[in-house]
């Protein structure tokens, strides 16, 4: 069968836009499509180590120079010609739900913000912050040692999680910083939410959205700029037309961007803000410490408490679980809990202040751990546990001030054992904790050193739900279910891109 006519999950699609500069480097950068036999098995051999490439700084390295845990001081080589190359990665054949005689499971994805590999005790024995709930999740499921975020900053990673594709494919770089639109997810783009809705799931997102949405002014003109003045122009009686409800989610409660950082300090419920902001945020009473900077002087709504944002998000997720149990317990659900913790400023809730011996940021990490524990506890209490896959990860590595200050004051390294932090191409910027739990399906206490990326969640959910991904969706997503269910050692991917 001609390569381009092979089924989506039986091929690796490579899309190139070659320039003269790339052509000069063909001898150093020859990529061949993968071929499959009649059983659609991957006809490739496991490599001793994997490669991690930057979208803007990319070329294969000799096998002997690939990164491993002992390569922390070796930089990614400065590579040529990547900006003109788009590489499509598709999911490879995997164990199906039917083969394992499984009903469609509920899926819960908990995404921390700026939580480093070394911030979690089960990844870092020298961590100064206790994370008993995340550690327990690892003991009850599978811990991945080589998981990566598709980007080293918030917005591109979230776009990739929601779409299963790299954000550079739509020309996006950087971070969405305000209330201006439009949504960065294209209108007709298949998302993880819309895919699961098509498969009969109830879908919900609670927390930060951070991939853009459009407000309108009183004249009905869309607000497309960020900053204080555009926020002042918003007509809050008009609905949002390109938010989570229009990108695959039945329920949404959260914020447009970082709830304690950006210009609009107000909650969105569904497609509008029920309690609009009325004044400039007063930062005078906010905590003062090395981790307290980073919030802009935006507009704030009455009752919006910057120190209790994550507890509000947690309560909304718990209310969703309880309501689903009462109204439609036999219908599968997808819950995406998108936390603010532990993004700067480090404003742990009042119940968590001085909960650790690692300062306010340590307390914030402890609050994130509490959130994980509270959600898992509620899922189990409601009887959802055995048929729910819980995934936990972070959108990128730890922030620069947190790493620098925590190293000095508490001998805690949130990037340990990797070099680099958030925004870096170094391993510490994109290697993230990733844990999966599914009782009686995923072996408790197991560990995988497979190289995976957060883009892989969508293809995995497609297999779990019985969805068939079209060729123009989730191009960079690989199904990791064979590793989760069967602990397959067959390599999921040859390399990982990040931007």
Would you name each region that the model predicts?
Residues 8, 12, 16, 33, ...:
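Generic alpha-helix initiation/capping and coil-helix boundary signal
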Residues 73, 80-91, 95-499:
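Formylglycine-dependent sulfatase
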């Amino acid at each position: 069968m001609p390569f381009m006519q092979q089924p989506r999950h039986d091929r690796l699609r490579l899309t190139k836009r070659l320039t003269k500069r790339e052509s000069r480097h063909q001898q150093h950068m020859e990529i061949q499509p993968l071929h499959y036999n009649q059983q659609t098995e991957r006809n490739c051999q496991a490599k001793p180590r994997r490669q991690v490439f930057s979208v803007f700084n990319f070329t294969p390295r000799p096998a002997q120079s690939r990164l491993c845990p002992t390569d922390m001081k070796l930089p990614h080589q400065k590579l040529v010609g990547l900006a003109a190359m788009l590489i499509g990665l598709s999911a490879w054949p995997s164990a199906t739900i039917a083969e394992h005689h499984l009903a469609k499971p509920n899926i819960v994805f908990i995404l921390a913000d700026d939580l480093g590999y070394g911030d979690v005790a089960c990844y870092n024995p020298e961590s100064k912050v206790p994370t008993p709930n995340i550690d327990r999740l690892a003991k009850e499921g599978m811990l991945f040692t080589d998981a990566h975020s598709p980007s080293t900053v918030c917005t591109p990673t979230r776009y990739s999680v929601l779409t299963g594709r790299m954000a550079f494919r739509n020309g996006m770089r950087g971070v969405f910083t305000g209330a201006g639109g439009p949504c960065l997810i294209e209108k007709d783009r298949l998302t993880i939410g819309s895919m699961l809705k098509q498969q009969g799931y109830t879908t919900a997102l609670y927390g930060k959205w951070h991939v853009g949405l459009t407000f309108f002014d009183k004249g009905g003109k869309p607000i497309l700029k960020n900053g204080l003045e555009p926020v002042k122009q918003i007509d809050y009686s008009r609905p949002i037309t390109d938010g989570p409800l229009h990108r695959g989610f039945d329920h949404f409660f959260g914020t447009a961007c970082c709830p304690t950082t950006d210009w609009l300090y107000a909650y969105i419920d569904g497609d509008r803000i029920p309690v609009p902001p009325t004044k400039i945020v007063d930062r005078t009473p906010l905590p003062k410490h090395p981790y307290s900077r980073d919030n802009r002087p935006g507009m704030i709504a009455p009752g919006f408490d910057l120190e209790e944002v994550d507890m509000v998000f947690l309560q909304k997720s718990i209310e969703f679980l309880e309501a689903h149990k009462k109204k439609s317990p036999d219908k599968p659900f997808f819950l995406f809990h998108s936390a603010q913790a532990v993004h700067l400023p480090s404003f742990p809730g009042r119940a968590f202040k001085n909960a650790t011996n690692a300062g306010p940021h340590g307390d914030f990490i402890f609050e994130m751990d509490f959130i994980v524990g509270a959600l898992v506890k509620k899922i189990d209490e409601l009887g959802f546990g055995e048929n729910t896959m819980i995934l936990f990860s972070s959108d990128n590595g730890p922030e620069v001030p947190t790493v620098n200050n925590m190293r000095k004051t508490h001998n805690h390294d949130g990037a340990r054992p990797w070099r680099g932090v958030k925004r870096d191409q170094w391993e510490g910027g994109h290697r993230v904790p990733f844990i999966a739990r599914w009782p009686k399906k995923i072996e408790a206490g197991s560990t995988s050193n497979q190289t995976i990326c957060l883009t892989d969640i969508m293809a995995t959910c497609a297999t779990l739900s019985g969805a068939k991904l079209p060729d123009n969706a989730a191009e960079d997503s690989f199904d990791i279910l064979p590793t989760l269910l069967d602990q397959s050692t067959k390599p999921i991917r040859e390399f990982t891109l990040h931007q």
